[in-house]
Amino acid sequence: MSADKLYIDKELSWLSFNERVLQEAADKTVPLIERIRFLGIFSNNLDEFYKVRFADVKRQILINRERGGNDISKHLLSRMQSKALKLNQDFDNLYNELILEMARRRIFLVNETQLDEIQLKWVKKYFHKEVLPHVTPIMLRDDIDVMQFLKDEYAYIAVEMRSGDEFKYALIEIPTDQLPRFVMLPEQKGKRRKTIILLDNIIRLCLDEIFRGFYDYDTLNGYAMKMTRDAEYDLRHEVEYSLLEQMSEGLSQRLTALPVRFVYEREMPEAMLKFLCYKLKISHYDSLIPGGRYHNFKDFISFPNVGRDYLENKPLPPMTCADFEGYANAFDAIRAQDILLHYPYHSFEHMTELVRQASFDPKVVSIKINIYRVAKDSKLMNSLVDAVHNGKRVVVVVELQARFDEEANIEWSRILTDAGVHVIFGVPGMKIHAKLLLITRKEGDEFVRYAHIGTGNFHERTARIYTDFALLTANQELAAEVRAVFGYIENPFRPVKFNHLIVSPRNSRTQIYRLLDSEIANAKAGKKAAITLKVNNLVDKGLINKLYGASAAGVKIRMIIRGMCSLVPGVEGVSDNIEIISIIDRFLEHPRVLVVHNDGNPQVFISSADWMERNIDHRIEVMAPIRDERLKQRIIDILNIQFIDTVKARRIDKEMSNQYVERGNRRKVRSQIAIYDYLKNVEKQTRKAKGQQETNDNSSQ
């Protein structure tokens, strides 16, 4: 097989991942409302794809054109467009199918032409009272630069006013930042039906009431449209500008960045479409996509369940971790033994409670934390402010370049700085993606450090839907190295050595290679050798080549890859010892885990880093060993449960076919539910053991 056939283009692999999301919307075993929400997730993902992946390839084409390079990127862009258009068609078909399915459940999503007289009267009243104050049309005159005000990823209604042979055009922003997108119509007596109308359709219904009295026209029509801009921005690195100022300017650039996608209602007249493309400076490298009458489907992530409970997933309430029970405070519990939390199965309240306790504990001297993404109304962040008020030294490393969270992080930076928190904006040229917390307490004559090392963000909301591991430890070797990471962030030019943590960009590549090479050596020596890897994305060619080498040497490799995967499994003599699955279900799989067999003494690591060049070589990431045998086995058990999933697991192959793992006649295993049950049993057994220990202690007194 030629070398180029050993790597799948990451952009095409990403589209294959989003196809797996669309499979969830198509799966009739998924509750109906959840299927509709998966349409929203698919749409949100695709928006980001165009902002980032598509825009990056388009940028490469323009660079190659200037430099006289080859047209490889053009070919890739064409394949991306073809695949995206196919997925959009599948999406439209699924949407129509689900609308009919909802109607069978007596839930009706109606447009403005389907209202009866009573509903029509109510909707018009709602429009005048709630909607009209938020509607201001923008007339598209010849002298107006649409690019200066058209918002990225907002849905608009493009209005055509015709008077004889003359046309005027206008744009109306659908004000979903001010009003709900889904409006529930009042129930009518004697009718057991729920009726929902989109805000878009309320505006369509009342177009005449917006323009009447200001413009003369014979006909008035509205068509849906949306534009996606390039999400990249250039930062000025002049000395006189702080990173905060640079980022603020960068966000302003994004607001007026060039378009990469224009989605329009397919019934839009040709003359109107040409006019809009001219005004929006749409090039032939951009994606022009005809669609239905609704855009910004990402709002469907929050589609309301107005029907029966069974139309949604059964709740899986987060459980409390028994390792914290029986102690006066969280620090005593962590000092007694390492604690592993697994969100969303465990409650994130354990983390917010730890920081809350630290904020007023008289023994706590300092708190250090790095923030990548946090909730808008974060209790954890408010506790950091409380800690400063209580005289603690608080250092917060804020990553201002967390994509699409930049604005929120800038705002939190200002709030924290105003409160007296020492805010650091990180290392120039490198994102800080590690998930670290360090709390220092004065216990007697000693300073004792407590560390958190995780795979996911300190984000209360996403911790309810993202699966992640969080290690809490009072191991002073690990805690000292977490402290060293913060020192490296504050002074990246000072030499630092890590003996226990694996830290990007210092030693991640060499240490991961060392771990994989050890398995290769064991396989060549005739010993059992195995690697288990779980990441979101695997696209780094150096790491892929090392895995190919391990497979060729006889190392058995199992992988769970949620998103992009450039490695091609099943190639004879190259990757025939590699098995890859991907799991898409109600929770988003987010942990990064590496397990090496190590000649029968497994080594287990959790990490913040995906296996991408940027994460390994150009970001600050932390990979931590799990020392506690009990916790090592727990992680291995959880991974093993995922590898026997017969409901939500798909095989990753070179054709990107997304075939479900063969189900056969075996008992169905849905791994996320099985993991919940497994952890529930772990907590039950822990409480039972604690109760037995308490009984023994009482009887010995």
Swiss-Prot record:
Recorded family membership: Belongs to the polyphosphate kinase 1 (PPK1) family.
E.C. number: 2.7.4.1
Function: Catalyzes the reversible transfer of the terminal phosphate of ATP to form a long-chain polyphosphate (polyP).
Record-level GO BP terms: polyphosphate biosynthetic process
Source species: Vibrio cholerae serotype O1 (strain ATCC 39315 / El Tor Inaba N16961)
Binding site for Mg(2+): R373, R403
Binding of ATP, residues: N45, Y466, R562, H590
Cofactor(s) of this protein: Mg(2+)
Highest classification ranks of the organism: Bacteria, Pseudomonadati, Pseudomonadota, Gammaproteobacteria, Vibrionales
Disulfide bonds: none
Entry PTM: An intermediate of this reaction is the autophosphorylated ppk in which a phosphate is covalently linked to a histidine residue through a N-P bond.
HAMAP family named among the record's database cross-references: Polyphosphate_kinase
PLD phosphodiesterase domain segment(s): 428-462, 585-615
Reaction(s) catalysed by this chain's protein: [phosphate](n) + ATP = [phosphate](n+1) + ADP
Enzyme class: transferase
Protein name, as recorded: Polyphosphate kinase
UniProt-annotated catalytic positions: H433
UniProt keywords, alphabetically: ATP-binding, Kinase, Magnesium, Metal-binding, Nucleotide-binding, Phosphoprotein, Repeat, Transferase
